[in-house]
Swiss-Prot record:
InterPro entries: EFTu-like_2 (IPR004161), G_TR_CS (IPR031157), GTP-eEF1A_C (IPR054696), P-loop_NTPase (IPR027417), T_Tr_GTP-bd_dom (IPR000795), TRAFAC_GTPase_members (IPR050100), Transl_B-barrel_sf (IPR009000), Transl_elong_EF1A/Init_IF2_C (IPR009001)
Domain of life, per lineage: Eukaryota
GO molecular function: GTP binding; GTPase activity; translation elongation factor activity
Modified residues (N,N,N-trimethylglycine): 2
GO cellular component: cytoplasm
Protein name, entry field: Elongation factor 1-alpha
Positions bearing N6,N6-dimethyllysine: 3, 315
Family classification: Belongs to the TRAFAC class translation factor GTPase superfamily. Classic translation factor GTPase family. EF-Tu/EF-1A subfamily.
Region (G5): 191-193
N6,N6,N6-trimethyllysine, modified sites: 79
Amino acid sequence: MGKEKNHVNVVVIGHVDSGKSTTTGHLIYKCGGIDKRTIEKFEKEAAELGKGSFKYAWVLDKLKAERERGITIDIALWKFETPKYYVTVIDAPGHRDFIKNMITGTSQADCAILIIAAGTGEFEAGISKDGQTREHALLAFTLGVRQLIVAINKMDTTKWSEQRFEIVKETSNFVKKVGYNPKSIAFVPISGWHGDNMLEESTNMGWFKGWTKETKAGVSKGKTLLDAIDAIEPPSRPTDKPLRLPLQDVYKIGGIGTVPVGRVETGTIKAGMVVTFAPANVTTEVKSVEMHHEQLEAGMPGDNVGFNVKNVSVKDIRRGNVCGDTKCDPPKEAASFVAQVIVLNHPGQIGNGYCPVLDCHTAHIACKFDTLQQKIDRRTGKALEEAPKFVKSGDACLVKMVPSKAMCVEPFADYPPLGRFAVRDMRQTVAVGVIKSVEKTDGKAGKVTKAAVKPVPRSSYAR
């Protein structure tokens, strides 16, 4: 056995009919963990329903009911392998929920794959000014996804035309406007359906000499989409940062006690550590840490862990609280925070006093837009107008926000997963935000359990 491969997360974005699901499905089919029998079953069912051409997209369908409707909605986490990586695909079909999932979702994508359909009319629709594609790409960029791969799909429908591949020039301008550097992007012509340039070089596009991208890490070259995924720069996982673990749930387990559960976002959690929960302001000792019912030496970023804490009742802490190391930049309640907010789809105008619900990590809390400080250019961040009266769809602004209940958030620059949020209103995501700074407070006097203030470990004077 060689060394374990690194994990990378990719998000697949693009216009609704660009072929996202088919392309993603094809990769999972060929490199993923789906067995032959399931695939054959899919093919048979698809043929019976007269949807033979959907068979790859079907790999992404878990729910029978969705199959009959002929569209994919389910956000599915799917995995496949490249020579270098284990890849998790965060499929992104349904637009509204996709946005929320991308922000509060379990994982920050390391790279976005933008799928553009080459068909005449399709391409133009995909990158038009108000297209979903622009929204998705902007969102990925705003949320800190800095690596991008562009796949020009459906080349089979253009008779594999080299001339049509020239749309990469327009696509290149398009991604540049969003904020990406086209030099650092692999542009690959593919057919997600036929499989050309997906895993193997296409025989239909002899004119394509391969892609090249240039980043700080150097120049890389390749022919296929798989090569491009393999050339993603490995993400640095934030183990060296202080611990931040947003709680998903808190359980009471007979004979063991209180067990909070959540995903380690930064740092590590170990037995014996003294931790603080914010904004509850509870401090105690971690007795043990486990994952998938096995004891763990240490929980690392990305691990979903359960841990047992001493003398804390399930009433003291709850979902949305954040656990951190008491001795190392412990988390605190946010009295207010300043965020860069992009309004995506709000039917009216947003002014001071607007109070929607924010979804940030596992917290779900109403926050007031206290003061609109500046309207800014969403690409450069430059100020366009000071103290605007209101903002509307398409605008970006700096806003001072005040939570209606105790809440723990962090600046995006310090702890990314705790520094991005979705603004929900009218059952949809109306805006997204990235936190610039936080005014912290110690909140109410907290509970410190006896376990947290042990003077000396017993072993040291039991000699």
